Regions:
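Glycine/small-residue-rich phosphate/adenosyl-binding loop
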Residues: 41-48, 55-115
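Single conserved hydrophobic/aromatic residue that forms the stacking wall/gate
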Residues: 1-11
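Small-aliphatic-rich amphipathic alpha-helix that forms the alpha element of a beta-alpha
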Residues: 50-51, 92, 100, 105-147
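C-terminal helix-cap and adjacent tail motif
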Residues: 5, 29, 159-190
Length: 190
C-alpha cells in the first residue's frame, strides 16, 4: 500500500476547461476503479486517438489487446505481479509486432515505439474520462507464454506493457503523492 496519497477531483470532471499543460500535469495513475468494464466504443475512440503516436519509419507496430473478462484480467495481473490489491476493471496488454523490425540493430525500437504509443494511449483514455494505471512488465519469457494461454496474442508480438483501465470509483481520485524531479535535474543544455 502507498503510504502517502493525494486526492483531487477526477480530471474527467474538469477536462473541458484545461489546456494541454494543465491536462498533462493532472493525469495520474489511479488504482481504485468502479466495478464493470469500459465500453468497447470508448476503447476504440481512445485507440484511434493514440494512433497519432509517431513510430520509427511509421511502422505502427503497437497492438492493443483489451481484456474485459474478469477472470482473465485477474490471471494477467497475477502474472504481472505488481497489481495485488488493486480493484480489477479491465486490462490492456500492449504488444509490439516484431516482424516489422528486420535488423538486429533495431532490437530496442519496438520498446521505444510502444513506449511512445503507451503515453499517447494513457492521454487518450484520460481524455475520454477513463482512469489508467500502467504496470511494469518484466518477463523472462515464461510469463508471456502463460499470458498467451489466456489471451490470443500471436507469437510474433512481444508484450511491452500492461495497463489497468476502468471508470473512476468516485468523483474524488486518490493517487500516489510522487513528486516530479525538477527540470534542472533532468534537462542538460550543452
Amino acid at each position: 500500500l502507498l503510504s502517502r496519497r493525494q486526492r483531487q477531483m477526477c480530471i474527467r470532471d474538469r477536462i473541458d476547461s484545461m489546456n494541454f499543460e494543465e491536462f498533462a500535469k493532472n493525469r495520474h495513475s489511479v488504482r481504485d476503479f468502479a466495478v464493470g468494464t469500459v465500453d468497447e466504443s470508448i476503447i476504440r475512440k481512445a485507440v484511434e486517438l493514440a494512433q497519432t503516436a509517431p513510430s520509427a519509419c511509421n511502422r505502427q507496430s503497437t497492438r492493443v489487446h483489451y481484456i474485459q473478462n474478469r477472470d482473465i484480467c485477474k490471471n494477467v495481473l497475477d502474472l504481472q505481479g505488481g497489481a495485488k490489491g488493486h480493484t480489477v476493471s479491465s486490462v490492456i496488454v500492449l504488444t509490439s509486432e516484431l516482424s516489422l523490425y528486420r535488423h538486429t540493430s533495431e532490437f530496442k525500437t519496438p520498446y521505444l515505439d510502444s513506449g511512445i504509443y503507451l503515453m499517447n494511449l494513457l492521454y487518450a483514455l484520460t481524455y475520454y474520462g477513463i482512469g489508467t494505471c500502467p504496470l511494469i512488465w518484466n518477463d523472462d519469457g515464461e510469463k508471456a507464454e502463460e499470458i498467451r494461454r489466456f489471451v490470443d496474442i500471436p507469437w510474433s508480438e512481444q508484450i511491452v506493457a500492461i495497463i489497468q483501465v476502468g471508470h473512476y470509483a468516485t468523483n474524488e481520485c486518490k493517487y500516489a503523492a510522487s513528486n516530479r524531479r525538477a527540470v534542472f535535474d533532468v534537462l542538460k543544455i550543452h
